[in-house]
C-alpha cells in the first residue's frame, strides 16, 4: 500500500513539473520567439 501512494506522489510531482516547464517554455517562446513581433509596448505608444 505504501508503494502505491509513493507512485502516485511521484506521478503528481512529474505532472506538476512538466506543466511548470511547459508554461515557462511557452512564455519564453511568446516573449522572445517569432510571436514577439506581434506584441506591442503600451509605454512606447503612449504620448505624454
From Swiss-Prot:
It is a single-pass membrane protein. GO terms for biological process: photosynthesis. GO terms for cellular component: plasma membrane-derived thylakoid membrane. The keyword Transmembrane applies. Its main location: membrane. The chain crosses the membrane at residues 12-34. Keywords: Membrane, Thylakoid, Transmembrane, Transmembrane helix. It is found in: Cellular thylakoid membrane. Belongs to the PsbN family. May play a role in photosystem I and II biogenesis. This is Protein PsbN. It comes from Prochlorococcus marinus (strain MIT 9313). The lineage of its organism: Bacteria, Bacillati, Cyanobacteriota, Cyanophyceae, Synechococcales. The gene is psbN.
